Amino acid sequence: MTSKISCFDRAVFRRALKKTAPVWILYTLYELLLPLRLFSFCRGVSSCTDDFLVQIEKTILGYARINASLLPFLLGGLLAWVLFFWLFRAGTAYFYAALPVRRETLFLTNYLTGLLLCAAPALLSSLLLWAVGAGFGAAVFVPAMQVFTATMLGFLLFFSFAVLVCCVVGQMAAMPIVYVILNFTFFVLETIVRHLLFTFVYGMPYSQSSTMQSFALHATPVLGLLQGGFRVQTDWLERDGMYYMEYAPRLEGWSYLGMLA
């Protein structure tokens, strides 16, 4: 039998959908909860406030922070673990190798399936966020698409890394452990070294900020994105000389997120 030249196989795709059904169903439910949360927020905030529309936009952008860090860290690792389980058992690997499907096709089909399972619910959620915001008079198409973009960049980072770990480790129980360890290696090592210096070097403050500490934080994507690397920033406007009002909310840290992805 001749091998297929295509980079995508429908039979492998359907099998991957069935294997990962619990994962992408839970993920889809989470994404659908975001528009409901926004709707609840909009109903709870008075539309008479001066910054009502700004608060809607800021709330939508706030979803991008988790969607670009903690969510893809968990989802990417879990999807890679399920999609590439055939690498973990010799019998399963031999079975797939005997199929009339090129190895490139097998790998790319599973990889593209993972990207699709993240992109489809994320895009649906972003469109619903746009619809909810528009229902309350806010033009939030751009912020909603920014949430989608941030989600995909974060997922591309963690899913690709998890796939690499699967290919290198090739052991079912060890893969999640190695995945977590490698994601937090720099931060843990820097913390240990700082603690040792604090213990044995006289006058060394434990909380001293250093270049190495900042590097370790940015080299740990989950923590780096959560702790200021990717954040919502707003400007403040003076009104009537008495108080300040937020305006022009935006996401900062796109270069850091793009560099990681």
Model regions and ranges:
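Start (N-cap) of specific transmembrane helices in multi-pass transporter permeases
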Residues: 15, 19, 105, 109-118, ...
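Short helix-to-coil transition segments within interhelical loops
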Residues: 97-104
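Secretory targeting signals
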Residues: 57-68, 113-179, 184-203
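Terminal transmembrane helical anchor/hairpin motif
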Residues: 41-62, 185-261
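Hydrophobic alpha-helical transmembrane segments of multi-pass membrane transport/permease proteins
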Residues: 18-46, 67-78, 181-189
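Hydrophobic cores of alpha-helical transmembrane segments in multi-pass inner/ER membrane proteins
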Residues: 75-78, 154-160, 257-260
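Long, hydrophobic alpha-helical segments
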Residues: 63-92, 103, 111, 118
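Aromatic- and glycine-rich beta-strand/loop motifs that create alpha-glucan
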Residues: 1-28
